[in-house]
Swiss-Prot record:
Homodimer; may also form higher oligomers. Identified in the CTLH complex that contains GID4, RANBP9 and/or RANBP10, MKLN1, MAEA, RMND5A (or alternatively its paralog RMND5B), GID8, ARMC8, WDR26 and YPEL5. Within this complex, MAEA, RMND5A (or alternatively its paralog RMND5B), GID8, WDR26, and RANBP9 and/or RANBP10 form the catalytic core, while GID4, MKLN1, ARMC8 and YPEL5 have ancillary roles. Interacts with RANBP9. Part of a complex consisting of RANBP9, MKLN1 and GID8. Interacts with CTNNB1, AXIN1 and GSK3B. It comes from Homo sapiens (Human). Transmembrane segments: none annotated. This is Glucose-induced degradation protein 8 homolog. The gene is GID8. InterPro entries: CRA_dom, CTLH/CRA, CTLH_C, LisH, Ubq-SigPath_Reg. Keywords: Cytoplasm, Nucleus, Ubl conjugation, Wnt signaling pathway. Its main location: cytoplasm. It comes from the Eukaryota.
């Protein structure tokens, strides 16, 4: 077939048959899973998976304990305690990553607003965040969005209510986790996440070339649709 010829389209059934015939070593899949559990700090799950699969983690699982404590604090909204623990483990981390420090401080402001501590929130914003807002337009915008929650009787239902969702805490934790791993010269992004990003990149390249192919439209469920 010449390069000028249009390749035959492949149906979803044909694509699924090719996938089913592709042999992937179980050990390789298990290593991907273990890598994800360790990188994300899921110690108990990693220990259980090691017993079930026989795959050894790349690091001593005991080294995950401090990251687990930080994660628990952030997901509970105990931001000041998390900052103190980060500083005790890596005194220079927040000094050298000012944007991360701002996000932690911003999250503490969100927690004060969640608890309806309006005066404390305003004072904290003025004394701890105002200077960073003056230095960074991006920080100023984020601080203004956060303080805008105070203008609503039901901030959870406001246009800025996403800041009060639990996913906001998870977002901050993910940023902290990556920063800590980078600081410790460890892998900060799970290999599985890198593979998914590669998949999205490949699909985007095909879309731009107007290629019709069975496309994965839901990564979390592995949903593949017919070519369109």
């Amino acid at each position: 077939m010449s390069y000028a010829e249009k390749p035959d389209e492949i149906t979803k059934d044909e694509w699924m048959e090719k996938l089913n015939n592709l042999h992937v070593q179980r050990a390789d899949m298990n290593r991907l899973i273990m890598n994800y559990l360790v990188t994300e700090g899921f110690k108990e799950a990693a220990e259980k998976f090691r017993m079930e699969s026989g795959i050894e983690p790349s690091v001593d699982l005991e080294t995950l304990d401090e990251r687990i404590k930080i994660r628990e604090m952030i997901l509970k909204g105990q931001i000041q305690e998390a900052i103190a623990l980060i500083n005790s483990l890596h005194p220079e981390l927040l000094d050298t990553n000012r944007y991360l420090y701002f996000h932690l401080q911003q999250q503490h402001l969100i927690e004060l607003i969640r608890q309806r501590e309006t005066e404390a929130a305003l004072e904290f914003a003025q004394t701890q965040l105002a200077e960073q807002g003056e230095e960074s337009r991006e920080c100023l915008t984020e601080m203004e969005r956060t303080l805008a929650l105070l203008a609503f009787d039901s901030p959870e239902e406001s246009p800025f209510g996403d800041l009060l969702h639990t996913m906001q805490r998870q977002k901050v934790w993910s940023e902290v986790n990556q920063a800590v791993l980078d600081y410790e010269n460890r892998e900060s992004t799970p290999k599985l996440a890198k593979l998914l990003k590669l998949l999205l990149w490949a699909q985007n390249e095909l879309d731009q070339k107007k290629v019709k192919y069975p496309k994965m439209t839901d990564l979390s469920k592995g949903v593949i649709e017919e070519p369109k």
